[in-house]
Regions:
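Catalytic cores of the polymerase beta-like nucleotidyltransferase superfamily
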Residues: 1-455
């Protein structure tokens, strides 16, 4: 027997009052599906609910945590609890008391489990009206709520981004007034809500709100100061911040890509120069990708992203400014690029889906000049990469005629960074001239490298 029919049976056969609650009711009102169900049970203890469920459903693994029980069944996550009041749970608290514990009006609605449709909706704080108006509003006075619980400020933005709703005016100004309090919130919580914003359907809309409220200035000041930093109108319609936010919109919904797109030009304010040459004025951002990659790594580590994510995003930013010129790039130059961005047999089959090229696509689409997402030169570049890749025997360290073990045996070296440095040096030689990939030749070159390095 499925869980919902069991609960309906419990509701009918006992004094229990059982209600759908919280985000699940919000989804029902919005006519959206949800794989998580929140249930509030009155007039009966949770222990009795657990017992009844086990009697009617075999092998049900129920977790008991203070105030509620949870389990997975029927492809759904269930949370069942008693009403809450001032941090305590009791089957004898009212729904009105429970609703007061919620943060947002749209999550403070209840529906009797026996109801057909939402006509019997119990709407304590007019949440349904806010859903109609596509508005995020808190229960109580916004200024007081955000001061008492500053985490609500980022949660407001992430919820609005998830639903594509606007933020209540009073709530926005409360966030703006109290934005500095976000420093008191756990960085893990801030990152959690930030990721939800970045991964939403249209992140730029809510990242702009994050900036306008002052939250971005506290959390990612390096990005905030990009506001108003103008660029060459020939290549960019927008300032640096708007360009970065638009690139984030245009990037596919992959966390690494979205983060790289958002931060790809974060180094520009640091290196911006205004130049007059030949009577013509222009703005330059030389090596902004180098500066930006270092900044992005620091930003992401400060936000407690894992090391692998920070390095991957930093690597994408560092390499995103490649400038392929067909007549100037030799075959060796193409091989160097292949090695640099780690193109292997797996990637060559779906080259246009490589993160570095997807980032370039998002970057180009965000310049505001209505250009095609992929330039003819990029198409030509990918074609040539395939051609060179298929012609080349050595493009990665693993393709070399010798490995680290040979180096250690030949030169009596111990495992360590030196081995990697030598192999990278040898790879650079073979990339320039594929015929150099011979054991004796590479050992001789390694010997030269070591004699130079040890001087």
């Amino acid at each position: 027997m499925k869980i919902i029919p069991i609960l309906k049976k419990l509701n009918k056969e006992t004094p229990a009052e059982i209600y759908y609650a919280g985000k699940y009711v919000c989804s029902l009102v919005r006519r959206k599906k949800s794989n998580s169900v929140e249930i509030v049970v009155r007039q009966i203890q949770l222990q009795a609910v657990s017992k009844y469920l086990r009697q009617h459903r075999e092998n049900l693994k129920i977790k008991r945590i203070r105030g509620y029980i949870s389990f997975f069944a029927d492809d759904t996550n269930f949370v069942i609890r008693n009403p809450k009041k001032k941090g305590k749970y009791s089957p004898y608290f009212t729904l009105k008391e429970d609703a007061k514990e919620k943060i947002f009006t749209i999550n403070a609605m209840y529906l009797p489990i026996s109801s057909k449709g939402v006509k019997s909706l119990i709407d304590v704080y007019r949440g349904r009206n806010d859903i109609r108006n596509r508005k995020i509003k808190v229960i109580g006075k916004a200024d007081k709520v955000t001061k008492q619980n500053p985490a609500i400020m980022m949660e407001t933005l992430s919820l609005a981004a998830h639903l594509n709703y606007r933020i209540d005016t009073n709530l926005f100004y409360a966030i703006k007034s109290n934005h500095a309090l976000i420093k008191k919130v756990s960085i893990n919580r801030v990152r959690f809500e930030f990721i939800k914003i970045v991964m939403s359907q249209r992140p730029s809309k809510y990242l702009k709100t994050m900036h306008a409220s002052g939250l971005m200035h506290v959390i990612i000041p390096e990005l905030s100061i990009c506001d108003g930093v103008t660029q060459n109108r020939k290549y960019h319609k927008y300032d640096v911040l708007t360009h970065c936010l638009t690139a984030c919109d245009n990037a596919e919904r992959d966390l690494l890509l979205r983060l790289a797109a958002l931060l790809h030009d974060v180094g520009k304010p640091q290196v911006r120069e205004e130049v007059v040459k030949g009577g013509k004025y222009k703005v330059t951002f030389y090596n902004h990708e180098v500066t930006g990659s270092k900044m992005a790594r620091r930003i992401l580590r400060r936000l407690k992203f894992d090391k692998e994510t920070a390095l991957a995003v930093s690597d994408l930013i560092y390499n995103h400014m490649y400038n392929y010129e067909p007549n100037r790039w030799s075959n060796a130059a193409v091989r160097r690029f292949i090695a640099k961005v780690h193109i292997s047999g797996k990637e060559i089959k779906r080259l246009s889906r490589m993160p570095i090229f997807l980032l370039r696509k998002a970057d180009r689409a965000a310049n505001g000049l209505n250009l095609s997402e992929i330039s003819p030169r990029q198409i030509s570049f990918e074609k040539r990469i395939r051609q060179i890749y298929n012609q080349s025997r050595v493009l990665h360290i693993k393709d070399l005629a010798i490995d680290g073990i040979v180096l250690m045996e030949e030169f009596k070296l111990k495992p360590g960074p030196t081995i990697g440095h030598i192999l990278n040096y040898l790879l650079s030689i073979v990339i320039e001239d594929q015929s150099m990939n011979q054991r004796n030749v590479l050992i001789e070159e390694a010997s030269k490298y070591l004699s130079t390095a040890l001087k």
